[in-house]
Swiss-Prot record:
Matches recorded under SUPFAM superfamilies: Ribosomal protein L16p/L10e
Superkingdom in the source lineage: Archaea
Family designation: Belongs to the universal ribosomal protein uL16 family.
Stored NCBIfam families: PRK04199.1-4
Protein's recorded name: Large ribosomal subunit protein uL16
GO MF entry, a single one: structural constituent of ribosome
Organism per entry: Picrophilus torridus (strain ATCC 700027 / DSM 9790 / JCM 10055 / NBRC 100828 / KAW 2/3)
Key word Ribonucleoprotein present: yes
Gene name as annotated: rpl10e
């Protein structure tokens, strides 16, 4: 069945639904790698992607954002010249009440009776001011990191801002 639009699951409504031991089976999240690049090197500049509104980010959106940032940094900077970390983990289970369509569907389906829904995916709950991604680079790749984080923010359902947390004097001198 086709994946429903992410806007159906973006708003945070109700309590967290995370207890997988009571569910019939939850699909694994598409995002599996949360830390990439060189973890040992001490980089000059650190930037963070910070959420500005509360929302739920589906695991597919987190993976799409991670892939876009990683591809841009890996191609231009190389694997040893950056560090990337994805902070939120998709714990929230998303349910969907599948409806039968087509000829004779009214005889098969029970409509909205017992419409709790089956688990179809997971999402991460994010609140205003929460850090979504952390990236670290040296001064020669600072502009590249800022552009990559901005591209990642486009793939997420909440408005985000890029904040320089380390090396702000260097980025100001570079005009970033």
């Amino acid at each position: 069945m086709v994946t429903k639009p992410a806007r159906m699951y973006t708003r945070i409504t109700g309590p967290a639904y995370t207890r997988k031991e009571f569910m019939g089976g939850v699909p694994y999240p598409k995002i599996t790698t949360f830390i990439q690049g060189n973890q040992k090197k001490d980089f000059e500049i650190e930037m963070m992607l910070v959420a500005e509104e509360a929302c739920q980010i589906r695991h597919t959106a987190l993976e799409a954002a991670r892939v876009s940032v990683n591809r841009k940094l890996l191609d231009a900077a190389g694997s040893d010249n950056y560090f990337l970390q994805i902070r939120p983990y998709p714990h929230q289970v998303i349910r969907e009440h599948k409806m039968a369509t087509g000829a004779g569907a009214d005889r098969i389906s029970s409509g909205m009776r017992a419409a709790f829904g089956r688990p179809v995916g997971t999402a991460a709950r994010v609140y205003p001011g929460q850090i979504i991604m952390v990236g670290r680079v040296d001064r020669n790749n600072a502009k590249l990191l800022k552009d990559a984080l901005h591209k990642a923010s486009i793939k997420l359902p909440t408005p985000c801002k890029v904040v320089v947390t380390k090396g702000s004097k260097i980025t100001e001198s570079l005009g970033i």
